[in-house]
Structure formats: structure tokens, C-alpha cells
Amino acid sequence: MEHSSASVPAALPYYVAFSQLLGLTVVAVTGAWLGLYRGGIAWESSLQFNVHPLCMVIGMIFLQGDALLVYRVFRREAKRTTKILHGLLHVFAFIIALVGLVAVFDYHKKKGYADLYSLHSWCGILVFVLYFVQWLVGFSFFLFPGASFSLRSRYRPQHIFFGATIFLFSVGTALLGLKEALLFKLGSKYSTFEPEGVLANVLGLLLVCFGVVVLYILAQADWKRPSQAEEQALSMDFKTLTEGDSPSPQ
């Protein structure tokens, strides 16, 4: 029975592989869109703006999605290692997204454009702040010494819920930004099936598909990482060992 509970569900590897194929395709199509129709990327030129969508797709979509899947993919590895990988992927995603934010604000400043007036920018700042807060709270509960098993168990459902919600919010914000970029450049020509518009629409569909597949994997209760009897909290607060609580699956 123990071997059965620790075995990998038959369909899980295929869904994970499909999610990675979609995620890499999203990044590649984003690069193709920026390269073919927006002139590529550069920091010290008018192409600086293009750093923003590329960084946001890599950080807030692809890497954030992969961070959420860590506990589904690494089912038998030590919980300590899995936690650290989960946290590091979120750190990388945050840093890359921060570069994207700096790029767009710096570009606007150089061009004399207004900041934070569109729905996309409002949603973007909100999701970025929520993402940072989610990481800080998650670090405090699951990696920082001091939190007990019982406290972690009470917070874990909220952490999982808000993690999935922020990811969904990130995908929606990316779609808003994509549409905004197309309308600014193409205007009324967007309705004439311009090649750039068609490619960007395909990118939007790929973003949705990636988000749906990641959330579907997370939603399957029997695909959660099984609890291991030997798993202990990363915290060095030894009094938790006497509280009688045990880790729960994620």
C-alpha cells in the first residue's frame, strides 16, 4: 500500500510534459512576436519597452507556473529540497518580473509617457505586489524557523488558494497587456487580420491553455504529493516535534 500511495499517477507525467511544451511555446512565440513585429529587445533604445512583455511572460507566467507544479513533479524527493526549489523558482520569477517593471517605467520616463493609467497597469501592479506578499508570507510560514506544524497546516490551504489565484490573475493581466499593445500599434487595422494581430491572438490562446493546464494539474487531489512519514519541517523550532502534528500533502 505504501508503494502504491507513493507511485506516480499514470496521467500526471503527460500533463506535466504538455504544460512544459505549452510554456516553452509561449516564451518562444513571445520572442517571435517581439522580434518579427516589434524590432527585438534592447535596454538603451526605443526597444526597451519590449523587455517588459518578455520578462513578464518568462517570470510571472512560465516560471510562476512551474513553481506551482514543483510539489506535483517532485513527489519522492526530500521535502526540504522541494520547498527550497519551490521558493527559488518564485524568487527567479520575481526578479525577472522586476526587471520587466523597471524597463517599462524607465521607458515611459524617457518618452514622457504617463504611468499607471490603464487597467492593465493597475492589474499588473496589484498582481506584482500580491505575488511579493505571497512569497514573503510563504517564506515566513514554511521556510523561516519558528512556525509550528499546526500553524502551517492552518495556513496551507490559504497559501495554495492565493498561489493559484495570483497565477490566474497574472495570465489575465498578460492578456490585457497584449490587447493593449495591439490596439496602440494597429488601431483599426487590428480588425483586418494583420499578421501581427493573428500571431498575438495565437499567443493569447497559448497563454490561456498554459494557465488552464497548470491549474488542472493543481486541482487533481489524487495528484498531490503524498505525505512521507519521515518528512519534518524545515524550521529548526524543535518544540514542534512534541505537538503531535504531521505534515500534510501539498
From Swiss-Prot:
UniProt-reported outcome of changing residue 86 to A: No effect on protein abundance. Decreased reduction by ascorbate
BP term (GO), one: ascorbate homeostasis
Modification type N-acetylmethionine: residues: 1
SMART domains recorded: B561
GO CC entries: chromaffin granule membrane
Disruption-associated phenotype: Mice lacking Cyb561 have significantly decreased amounts of norepinephrine and normetanephrine in the adrenal gland and brain while the biosynthesis of dopamine, the norepinephrine precursor, is normal pointing to a defect in the catecholamine biosynthesis downstream of dopamine probably at the level of the dopamine beta synthase.
Positions bound to L-ascorbate: 79, 83, 152
Cofactor binding mode and count: Binds 2 heme b groups non-covalently.
A Pfam cross-reference name: Cytochrom_B561
Gene3D superfamilies membership: 1.20.120.1770
Membrane topology: Multi-pass membrane protein
Record topology, Vesicular segments: 37-50, 105-123, 179-197
EC numbers for this chain: 7.2.1.-
Regions that span the bilayer: 16-36, 51-71, 84-104, 124-144, 158-178, 198-218
InterPro entries: CYB561/CYBRD1-like, Cyt_b561/ferric_Rdtase_TM
Domain Cytochrome b561: 18-219
Tissues in which the protein is found: Abundantly distributed in a number of neuroendocrine tissues.
Keyword field: Acetylation, Cytoplasmic vesicle, Electron transport, Heme, Iron, Membrane, Metal-binding, Phosphoprotein, Translocase, Transmembrane, Transmembrane helix, Transport
Residue ranges that the UniProt entry lists as topological domain Cytoplasmic: 1-15, 72-83, 145-157, 219-250
PROSITE patterns the UniProt entry points to: CYTOCHROME_B561
Broad class of the protein's primary localization: membrane
Binding site for heme b 2: 72, 79, 86, 159, 224
Role summary: Transmembrane reductase that uses ascorbate as an electron donor in the cytoplasm and transfers electrons across membranes to reduce monodehydro-L-ascorbate radical in the lumen of secretory vesicles. It is therefore involved the regeneration and homeostasis within secretory vesicles of ascorbate which in turn provides reducing equivalents needed to support the activity of intravesicular enzymes.
Protein name, entry field: Transmembrane ascorbate-dependent reductase CYB561
Source organism (scientific name): Mus musculus
